[in-house]
């Protein structure tokens, strides 16, 4: 497998605080890669650097063979790399289907991009993906009324609407009750195997990451 993400000697500091120092790692195309380490070691900062939320101070970041460290979030998203967050970023006053439909913004010209111009097809895809993550029965509910775990599943489905090549997930099981964790593990695995999405996952739950990832990096 080729490397779809290649991080080389990346450093990032906030004033006098060094969040990342000479970090290097690779993510193989089609893999699930884990990123572990204690709180405060710079995992989330590294994710933010990769997707363009802030400039890096040194090093390089390549995505699918292209240097992206100079690009902004929207440009990187349009190339096919998205991320989710520890705290969900959903529209809590809207129902689940509307959340899904409004999320279609980054990759209008994807291989299945024709659906993006057809409202009925967008809704059909939204409902299919809600079924994929186990939220079809909740599709018309206001998303703010969902449990936190269900909101994380919704955010995951919203990312899938944009057909990413790579999805970075920041602690996807944090705050989720144990009964939902197994279902989330299953759906992440299916997204990788059935949809061909490369996953890079920050996770503190070692059972989860050992079950999911084929490669694991540790930041100290």
Task: Please report, for each region that a protein language model flagged, where it lies by residue.
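The feature captures the beta-strand-to-loop junction immediately N-terminal to the Walker
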Residues: 36-38
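Helix-to-loop junction immediately C-terminal to a conserved catalytic motif
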Residues: 51
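Conserved ABC ATPase "signature" region
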Residues: 113-138, 179, 186-189, 198
